[in-house]
Amino acid sequence: MAPKITSELLRQLRQAMRNLEYVTEPIQAYIIPSGDAHQSEYIAPCDCRRAFVSGFDGSAGTAIVTEEHAAMWTDGRYFLQAAKQMDSNWTLMKMGLKDTPTQEDWLVSVLPEGSRVGVDPLIIPTDYWKKMAKVLRSAGHHLIPVKDNLVDKIWTDRPERPCKPLITLGLDYTGISWKDKVADLRLKMAERNVVWFVVTALDEIAWLFNLRGSDVEHNPVFFSYAILGLETIMLFIDGDRIDAPIVKEHLLLDLGLEAEYRIQVLPYKSILSELKILCASLSPREKVWVSDKASYAVSEAIPKDHRCCMPYTPICIAKAVKNSAESEGMRRAHIKDAVALCELFNWLEKEVPKGGVTEISAANKAEEFRRQQADFVDLSFPTISSTGPNGAIIHYAPVPETNRTLSLDEVYLIDSGAQYKDGTTDVTRTMHFGTPTAYEKECFTYVLKGHIAVSAAVFPTGTKGHLLDSFARSALWDSGLDYLHGTGHGVGSFLNVHEGPCGISYKTFSDEPLEAGMIVTDEPGYYEDGAFGIRIENVVLVVPVKTKYNFNNRGSLTFEPLTLVPIQTKMIDVDSLTDKECDWLNSYHLTCRDVIGKELQKQGRQEALEWLIRETQPISKQP
């Protein structure tokens, strides 16, 4: 993987930083975040500014360019990838390591006195702005909003913003109509004297209106904003896609609806001007809800006295708790996904010994089998298909320059998922097609122990995800090992594969308590640089569980695995498992055999069924 040569781009960007057509005064540093105007994790090609200017295209990272330096902050998932993709103009800042300075501290250390630091206010989150501005101000510097995005000014062949057709979802999939969702939100608004709710996150808008799109690859969302009032609904969206008959019928646009459910459709880019008009007529005590992750530009359009910022919006929290229709849809999606993976792993077992199966061809085969399933829409993220040392790159995606052939001598890791109309999947399995070494089995077994510890955990209602994170790491920690990513993230229902506010991690997104109906992943791992990667990932549903006692009547919760794909027993040091762990795995495999076996039989996939039966044989420790 040859790094991108960035010398000329950086020269042009630094020139733009001094160009008075774009800035009122020259700026001494420019911040280029990962996200778009909606702070999305996965973004459209037209918003890949950080990747364009640096070459690093991982989903998380922030670039900062000064007159003399170019630095990139990213987390442990991307250390190896970023190092390979960036040239010598860039300094990699490894977030989470004790010697790595924060972005603001680094700026203070390298900038001349009284510097101006610029950023596009439409793509910087409000919470980030506040933190950065405070530190810079205390050191005598200034954070400046730069209205014209400077990367756009030097990006001559920047792609157009997508504007693709919309998908409507009926009650069979959503369980609740968009009108009822609006009514529920208005009740919450009225309780708090909130008259307007500005919705900026793309998945929140899609969920609210029971619509999906395909403007961002693998994420069924569409570019839009929404403003919800107590008697008004405004949807900011471009193109004629809103005029499609099926969409007009779904949103009841042609019906003489009561005024409070009539949707006003406005141009996408008019959000700031319309918001300022609405705020101009607010009475003194009236409030406007907005996420603190909304862009600084949107937040600043609301007068400070009226602005009510929230870390998680009511939509974010409601969306995370799946209703029965959504939970059932997720179960159906995971059954179909397991069928596809049984087909894939059966195919790999036959083909890998012959030679010629590569990381890319294996990923393509996984997609081929998924496409055969009903209601398949797209993958849910680019498939991580990695063998040998590539497996140690946590978010590796194979490209022709790095494409390795699967062999009988290396560990193979595949992390993949799909968007079905009834649900979103995300599953990782690690396997060996020959004979794993004792060390590979040892590491795999530590990871499996952590996976089981989380999946089998029983915990009080109100427990936050970070309290479960150590369950996944305990066996690794006992041996002095660890991994540099969270243990689990929320998963959308035919929505983004990563969603808040719940998760299992030492990081801040796991601040919201887990509750019944939430769906998260359980994915501990271990990565040996230059050798292999191991990860075992299931999507799990939070469910109530009965316990012997019920302290303070608070109730208890546990997890139901939705992913039903065998875990390769060849990779396990069975004698290192406890009896409880053996029982858990045997029970899990029995469920895989019963549930997925029936579906394989129904679909006439006999070879894959035979593979499933072989892979779900009970394990037992040596007496």
From Swiss-Prot:
Enzyme nomenclature, EC number: 3.4.11.9
Name the UniProt record assigns to this protein: Xaa-Pro aminopeptidase 1
Keyword terms of this UniProt record: Acetylation, Aminopeptidase, Cytoplasm, Hydrolase, Manganese, Metal-binding, Metalloprotease, Protease
Broad class of enzyme this protein falls into: hydrolase
UniProt catalytic activity: Release of any N-terminal amino acid, including proline, that is linked to proline, even from a dipeptide or tripeptide
Function: Metalloaminopeptidase that catalyzes the removal of a penultimate prolyl residue from the N-termini of peptides, such as Arg-Pro-Pro. Contributes to the degradation of bradykinin.
Cofactor note: Binds 2 manganese ions per subunit.
Entry binding sites for a peptide: R77, H395, H489, H498, E523
N6-acetyllysine found at: K304
Cellular component annotations (GO), alphabetically ordered: cytosol
Binding partners and assembly: Homodimer.
GO BP annotations listed: bradykinin catabolic process; negative regulation of programmed cell death; proteolysis
